[in-house]
């Protein structure tokens, strides 16, 4: 395995291979992908589907001189394997290893950092403009999937690129076969005709000639109408032509010769070109071919069977959310569910099956999802927008302007909040407390366990205004689930442990950690109170002030950035109430982007473990009891 792959480190090496060798290389790459992702987890099906396309791109274009931008970037594994990262590929998505997404800091071949959807065409257009302004000569290629083309920013960029007419290539990787019926003799003929240089030159000469004769313009318009009628009938790319692009395709994305030929034609063309490539998600691995959605993003699995390696029998927060939504649908007949191309990812598959008329997958259109929910709310419904924390950032203005300004009853179910692990900086949900907290009318909740999650969702749906419930990407605590729902009083914290010397004020995933830390501190003779804040907004003012005044030492714990987060809210409260004699120590994520790696490892790296919290409290008490002695020790250290 890897006989040819071991010799490949750049586009130059790809160009030296015959087509027979390239097909052999494609087989080697697929085997490496399957074996590696079965251990590390990752996006398998998308990468299996773009092996030949990636080889074709690197055969025609000269990376890193030519720029290849991968939309979302989850399908860039093949690109990484053939650009000098094969030997390190076993570290994929591991801490300190190869990222699962393009990172310019990792390789000069990663022209632009991606992770969120639909950004590639805008970035590629910007790079093409920069190239032209500097008088440089190289190609810029954006590779975007049909799913990502549902994002509004992609069409904004297409519209702008068509207007500017600069040299830009967009490769549409269509792995849904949604336009497969248009692949036929006439479509193939038109593609061959339009990629012929003689056709292009002849077309330009005829247009120039017609414009010189008196009735030429009328004939030209008539000819365009006839041509457009035929193209609408047989060519699936007419929309791109209308946007100002030359459309080439569809082409078989697993035929290396065909891909190479069409990309060569695209490179030779002037102006914006769209190449439509049809691929099969999961190609070459039967479990992924038969169930591409499950293998889109997957954890460790058994290669022989394709079955996931189950790490825990405890349901995840996502699974609990999905089950709760089904139960809530019986309680609230006006409840609707909305997601942005994440039906399975947000746990809504069963809800969608049982309540198809009450479920809406809007595609990769987070802004639309939120304002759609606002419209539904004005019509008397209670929409739940289920979305990952990192993707909700894309709809900030809609949250503020369309939902909160009008105080509409929209519930935001914010999945993947906090550190998500191996997907890294583009996917951690570390900012939602900070970006939601300043918005008037917004209620923000975070459950300590899965039982509290179901009650918070019920509370949010019973609340007359906007509310957000955020929860992590992890298994629950395994706690007992109540049989019936209950409303949690708005802004009411929960005292889990009384104490007189220090207050551990935690929210969400950090509550269990605080309880364990308090138990250890008790063994050291320190009486710690533990408060489950439940709400980041509104805070339980009475409870927080009572314990802050009693203990004078407060430690806040959150899985969010410190700037503007839960700890900041507590400090603001104490300051506004004149409590200047209280020491507040905030645990959370510092002012930095968190890299990829195992969730437990990353939590430890940023001080969010039981042991590190205990150590910090002990050091604080040692400092209070022996301030001079501790100061000497610190200076020596």
UniProtKB/Swiss-Prot annotation:
InterPro entries: Dxylulose-5-P_synthase, THDP-binding, Transketo_C/PFOR_II, Transketolase-like_Pyr-bd, Transketolase_BS, Transketolase_C, Transketolase_CS. Disulfide bonds: none annotated. One of its GO terms (biological process) is terpenoid biosynthetic process. Mg(2+) binds at residues 146, 175. Its cofactor is Mg(2+); thiamine diphosphate. HAMAP family: DXP_synth. This is 1-deoxy-D-xylulose-5-phosphate synthase. It comes from Pelotomaculum thermopropionicum (strain DSM 13744 / JCM 10971 / SI). The lineage of its organism: Bacteria, Bacillati, Bacillota, Clostridia, Eubacteriales.
